C-alpha cells in the first residue's frame, strides 16, 4: 500500500513538472523577433541580424517570413543559423503608381496576423541589434519610431498580432493613401494620431504601469532605431552612441553588405564586426561568405596577374626584350645625374639614352593628324568608364570591403590599359601607314636611327601609367588614411582628387597619342610592335 502511494506521488509530481515545463515553454514562445526576406539579395543582412540578436544574449524565437523569391538553399541556411522559416505569399501593392522596389512591401502587414505569438518585434533586414532589446516586449499594442517630418518608420516595430486588426487593414489598404507608395505610408495613414503617442519608457516598473491605462500605441526613442542617414548628415549620433540598441542602415542603395558602402559610411564598421563572427553553419558560410563568391574572387584575382606574367614573359623572350630593362636603368641614371647636378640636363647628357626620347623633327610633327589629341582624350575617358562599369559588374557585391576594392582596382587598371593600349597600337600603325606613303628622306633617317634601338622600352608610357594609377588609388584611399569619417568631406576630397586625375589623364592621353603616332612614323619598317599587346615593350 505504501509502495502504491509512493508511486502515485511520483507520478503526480512528474505530471506537475511536465505541465509546468509546458507552461514555461509556452510563455517563452509567446514573443518573437521577426524579419522579412523577399529574395536572396538580403540573405546576408538577415544572417547578420540574427547573429546580432543572439550576441545580446536573447533566446527568443527568431522568425523569418520568406517569399517565393527566396531559394531553398537560403531557407536551409537560415534554419541552420537558428531562424524559424515561414513561407508567405506576397501582398500586391494596391497603388497604381509606385516604385518597382515597392511592389510587394505591403507583405510586411502580415506580421499583424502572426497570431501564434502574443507580441512580436519586427526588424528590417538592414538593421543590427547592438544592445539587448528584450524591453521592447513591454511596449504597448503598437510601437514604432517617429522620424523626421512626423512620420513613423516601419523598420523597427512592436506589434500585438490580431486577426481582427489585420482584416481591418486589408479592408482599408485600397482606400487609405500612402505617401511612400508602400507599407510605411499606409501605416502612417492607418495610425494618424501616432505623433501624439507617448514615448515608451522601459524603466517604468510594472506596478506603475498597472495604475495607467494601456495606450493603443507608443513611440520608440532613437535608441531603438538609430538612422544611419541622419548620422551621416551630422557625422555623429544625436544621442550617446554607447546607449544605442538598434542601428538602421537607411541610406537607400548603400546597404551594409555591399563592399563599397564601407568606404563611404563609417557606421558600417559595426555591421562588419558582426558579420566576420558568423559561424560556418553550412560549408563555406563562415564570416558571411559563400563558396560561389570565394571561387569568383580567386579567379578574378589571379587572371590579371597571370596575364601580366605572360606579357612579361613574351617581352623577355623577344629578341630585344632585354633592352627594356636597359632603357629603364638609363632613365634612372638620367634622373640621378640631373638631381645631383641640381640643374637642367639635356637629353645628350647621358650618352646611353634611347634615341626615342630625342626631340622629333618639325617634318614629323607636321604629319600628326589635327584632331588626334581630342580623339585620344575621348577614347581615354571612354576606356575609364567601360573599365569601371565592367569591374563593378564582375566583382561580387557582398564580399569584404578590402577584397572588393583591390579587385575593382586590379580589373579597372587591367581593362583600361588593354583598351587604351590597343588604341595606342592603332595610332602607332596609323603612323606607319602614313610614313610608308611618304617618301621623305628625313623620315628615312629617323627610321634608321630608331631601328638601332627598336626594341627599347617606352618608359614615358610607363611613367604616365604609374601616375594615373597613383592618383586613382589616392582618390579613394587618402580620406581613409587621413581618418576622415564625414560623408560629405570624404566625397569632397574624392571628387577633388578625381578632378586632378582627370586633368592628368587629359594631358597624358593627348601626349601619348602624339608620341605613339610619331613612333609609328619612325618604326614603319619595324613589324615587331604590332604583333604584341604588351605595348610598353
Curated annotation (Swiss-Prot):
- How does the protein's chain sit in the membrane according to the entry? Multi-pass membrane protein
What catalytic activity does the UniProt entry give for this protein? glucuronate acceptor + UDP-alpha-D-glucuronate = acceptor beta-D-glucuronoside + UDP + H(+); a 1D-myo-inositol-1-phospho-N-[(R)-2-hydroxy-very-long-chain fatty acyl]-(R)-4-hydroxysphingoid base + UDP-alpha-D-glucuronate = an alpha-D-glucuronosyl-(1<->6)-1D-myo-inositol-1-phospho-N-[(R)-2-hydroxy-very-long-chain fatty acyl]-(R)-4-hydroxysphingoid base + UDP + H(+)
Record's subcellular location: Golgi apparatus membrane
Please state the Enzyme Commission number of this protein.
2.4.1.17
Q: What domain of life? A: Eukaryota
Q: In which pathway does it act?
A: Sphingolipid metabolism
Q: What SUPFAM superfamilies is this protein classified in?
A: Nucleotide-diphospho-sugar transferases
Q: What cofactor is this protein dependent on?
A: Mn(2+)
Q: In which tissues is it expressed?
A: Expressed in seedlings, roots, leaves, stems and siliques.
What molecular functions are annotated in GO for this chain? glucuronosyltransferase activity; metal ion binding; sphingolipid alpha-glucuronosyltransferase activity
> Which terms does the UniProt entry file under GO BP?
ceramide biosynthetic process; inositol phosphoceramide metabolic process; pollen development; pollen tube guidance
Residue ranges of the TM segments: 6-26, 293-313, 375-395, 406-426, 468-488, 494-514
The UniProt keyword set, sorted, is:
Glycosyltransferase, Golgi apparatus, Manganese, Membrane, Metal-binding, Transferase, Transmembrane, Transmembrane helix
| Disruption of the gene: reported phenotype | Defect in transmission of mutated alleles through the male gametophyte (e.g. pollen). Pollen rescued mutants show severe dwarfism with reduced roots, compromised pollen tube guidance, and constitutive activation of salicyclic acid-mediated defense pathways. They have also an altered sphingolipidome with reduced glycosyl inositol phosphorylceramides (GIPCs), increased ceramides, and an increased incorporation of short-chain fatty acids and dihydroxylated bases into inositol phosphorylceramides and GIPCs.
What's a GO cellular component annotated to this UniProt protein?
Golgi medial cisterna
Binding positions for Mn(2+) per the UniProt entry: 124, 126, 248
Q: Where is this site: Important for catalytic activity?
A: 108
The residues the record assigns to binding substrate are: 124-126, 153-155, 180-184, 248-255
EC class (word): transferase
Q: Which Gene3D superfamilies match?
A: Spore Coat Polysaccharide Biosynthesis Protein SpsA, Chain A
The entry assigns this protein to a family as follows: Belongs to the glycosyltransferase 8 family. Glycogenin subfamily.
> What job does this protein perform?
Mediates the transfer of glucuronic acid (GlcA) from UDP-GlcA to glycosyl inositol phosphorylceramides (GIPCs). The formation of GIPCs sphingolipids is essential for pollen function, plant growth and defense. Required for global fitness.
The protein, known as = Inositol phosphorylceramide glucuronosyltransferase 1
Which gene does this sequence derive from? IPUT1
Amino acid at each position: 500500500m505504501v509502495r502504491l502511494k509512493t508511486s502515485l506521488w511520483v507520478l503526480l509530481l512528474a505530471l506537475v513538472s511536465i505541465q509546468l515545463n509546458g507552461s514555461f515553454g509556452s510563455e517563452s514562445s509567446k514573443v518573437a523577433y521577426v524579419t522579412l526576406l523577399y529574395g536572396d539579395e538580403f540573405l546576408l543582412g538577415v544572417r547578420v541580424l540574427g547573429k546580432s540578436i543572439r550576441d545580446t544574449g536573447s533566446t527568443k524565437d527568431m522568425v523569418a517570413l520568406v517569399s517565393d523569391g527566396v531559394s531553398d538553399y537560403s531557407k536551409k541556411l537560415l534554419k541552420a543559423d537558428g531562424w524559424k522559416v515561414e513561407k508567405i505569399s506576397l501582398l500586391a501593392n494596391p497603388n497604381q503608381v509606385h516604385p518597382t522596389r515597392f511592389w510587394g512591401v505591403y507583405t510586411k502587414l502580415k506580421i499583424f496576423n502572426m497570431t501564434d505569438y502574443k507580441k512580436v518585434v519586427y526588424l528590417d533586414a538592414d538593421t543590427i541589434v547592438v544592445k539587448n532589446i528584450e524591453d521592447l516586449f513591454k511596449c504597448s499594442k503598437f510601437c514604432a519610431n517617429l522620424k523626421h517630418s512626423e512620420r513613423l518608420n516601419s523598420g523597427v516595430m512592436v506589434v500585438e498580432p490580431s486577426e481582427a486588426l489585420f482584416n481591418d487593414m486589408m479592408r482599408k489598404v485600397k482606400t487609405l493613401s500612402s505617401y511612400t507608395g508602400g507599407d510605411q505610408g499606409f501605416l502612417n495613414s492607418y495610425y494618424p494620431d501616432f505623433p501624439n503617442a507617448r514615448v515608451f519608457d522601459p524603466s517604468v516598473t510594472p506596478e506603475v504601469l498597472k495604475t495607467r491605462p494601456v495606450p493603443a500605441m507608443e513611440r520608440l526613442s532613437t535608441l531603438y532605431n538609430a538612422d544611419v542617414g541622419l548620422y551621416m548628415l551630422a557625422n555623429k549620433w544625436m544621442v550617446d552612441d554607447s546607449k544605442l540598441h538598434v542601428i538602421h542602415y537607411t541610406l537607400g542603395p548603400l546597404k551594409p553588405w555591399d563592399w563599397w558602402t564601407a568606404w563611404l559610411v563609417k557606421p558600417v564598421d559595426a555591421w562588419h564586426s558582426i558579420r566576420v563572427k558568423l559561424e560556418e553553419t553550412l560549408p563555406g558560410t563562415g564570416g558571411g561568405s559563400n563558396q560561389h563568391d570565394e571561387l569568383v574572387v580567386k579567379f578574378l584575382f589571379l587572371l590579371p596577374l597571370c596575364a601580366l606574367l605572360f606579357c612579361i614573359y613574351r617581352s623577355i623572350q623577344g629578341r630585344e626584350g632585354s633592352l627594356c630593362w636597359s632603357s629603364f636603368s638609363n632613365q634612372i641614371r638620367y634622373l640621378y645625374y640631373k638631381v645631383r647636378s641640381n640643374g637642367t640636363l639635356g637629353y645628350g647628357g647621358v650618352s646611353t639614352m634611347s634615341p626615342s626620347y630625342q626631340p622629333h623633327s618639325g617634318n614629323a610633327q607636321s604629319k600628326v593628324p589635327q584632331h588626334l589629341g581630342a580623339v585620344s582624350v575621348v577614347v581615354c575617358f571612354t576606356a575609364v568608364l567601360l573599365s569601371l562599369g565592367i569591374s563593378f559588374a564582375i566583382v561580387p557585391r557582398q564580399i569584404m570591403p578590402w577584397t572588393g576594392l583591390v579587385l575593382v582596382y586590379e580589373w579597372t587598371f587591367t581593362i583600361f590599359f588593354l583598351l587604351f593600349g590597343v588604341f595606342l597600337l592603332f595610332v602607332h600603325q596609323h603612323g606607319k601607314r602614313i610614313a610608308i606613303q611618304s617618301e621623305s628622306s628625313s623620315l628615312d633617317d629617323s627610321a634608321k636611327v630608331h631601328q638601332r634601338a627598336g626594341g627599347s622600352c617606352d618608359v614615358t608610357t610607363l611613367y604616365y601609367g604609374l601616375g594615373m594609377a597613383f592618383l586613382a588609388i589616392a582618390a579613394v584611399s587618402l580620406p581613409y588614411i587621413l581618418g576622415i569619417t564625414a560623408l560629405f568631406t570624404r566625397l569632397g576630397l574624392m571628387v577633388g582628387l578625381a578632378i586632378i586625375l582627370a586633368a592628368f589623364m587629359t594631358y597624358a592621353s593627348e601626349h601619348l597619342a602624339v608620341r605613339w603616332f610619331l613612333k609609328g612614323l619612325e618604326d614603319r619598317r619595324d613589324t615587331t610592335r604590332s604583333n604584341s599587346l604588351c605595348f610598353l615593350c
